[in-house]
C-alpha cells in the first residue's frame, strides 16, 4: 500500500469517526485542537486505525500521535 493510499484511508476514517468534512483535514491538523476530538474520539480513532491497517499501536506510541501526518507516518513505518 502506498503512502497516498494510506493517507486516503486515514482521511476516510477521520471523516467517519469524527464527523468532519474531508476538506477540513490537512496533514498538520491536530486531532484535538483542529478537528475537535476529545480523548474518547482519539482512542476510537486509534482502534479503527489498528483494525483497518492490521497494526498494533501501543499506548505509549498512541500518545505521540497528535496530528494526521503523525498517524500516516506511523502506519507507513509498520
Swiss-Prot record:
<feature type="domain" description="Carrier">
    <location>
        <begin position="4"/>
        <end position="78"/>
    </location>
</feature>
<dbReference type="GO" id="GO:0009245">
    <property type="term" value="P:lipid A biosynthetic process"/>
</dbReference>
<dbReference type="GO" id="GO:0000035">
    <property type="term" value="F:acyl binding"/>
</dbReference>
<dbReference type="GO" id="GO:0005829">
    <property type="term" value="C:cytosol"/>
</dbReference>
<keyword id="KW-0443">Lipid metabolism</keyword>
<comment type="function">
    <text>Carrier of the growing fatty acid chain in fatty acid biosynthesis.</text>
</comment>
<keyword id="KW-0276">Fatty acid metabolism</keyword>
<dbReference type="GO" id="GO:0000036">
    <property type="term" value="F:acyl carrier activity"/>
</dbReference>
<dbReference type="Pfam" id="PF00550">
    <property type="entry name" value="PP-binding"/>
</dbReference>
<dbReference type="InterPro" id="IPR036736">
    <property type="entry name" value="ACP-like_sf"/>
</dbReference>
<comment type="pathway">
    <text>Lipid metabolism; fatty acid biosynthesis.</text>
</comment>
<keyword id="KW-0444">Lipid biosynthesis</keyword>
<dbReference type="InterPro" id="IPR009081">
    <property type="entry name" value="PP-bd_ACP"/>
</dbReference>
<keyword id="KW-0963">Cytoplasm</keyword>
<keyword id="KW-0275">Fatty acid biosynthesis</keyword>
<dbReference type="InterPro" id="IPR003231">
    <property type="entry name" value="ACP"/>
</dbReference>
<keyword id="KW-0597">Phosphoprotein</keyword>
<protein>
    <recommendedName>
        <fullName>Acyl carrier protein</fullName>
    </recommendedName>
</protein>
<dbReference type="GO" id="GO:0016020">
    <property type="term" value="C:membrane"/>
</dbReference>
<comment type="similarity">
    <text>Belongs to the acyl carrier protein (ACP) family.</text>
</comment>
<keyword id="KW-0596">Phosphopantetheine</keyword>
<feature type="modified residue" description="O-(pantetheine 4'-phosphoryl)serine">
    <location>
        <position position="39"/>
    </location>
</feature>
<dbReference type="InterPro" id="IPR006162">
    <property type="entry name" value="Ppantetheine_attach_site"/>
</dbReference>
Amino acid at each position: 500500500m502506498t503512502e497516498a493510499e494510506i493517507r486516503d484511508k486515514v482521511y476516510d476514517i477521520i471523516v467517519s469517526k469524527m464527523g468532519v468534512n474531508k476538506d477540513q483535514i490537512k496533514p498538520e491538523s491536530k486531532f484535538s485542537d483542529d478537528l475537535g476530538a476529545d480523548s474518547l474520539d482519539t482512542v476510537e480513532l486509534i482502534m479503527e486505525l489498528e483494525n483497518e491497517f492490521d497494526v498494533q499501536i501501543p499506548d505509549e506510541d498512541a500518545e505521540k500521535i497528535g496530528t494526521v501526518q503523525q498517524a500516516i507516518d506511523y502506519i507507513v513505518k509498520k
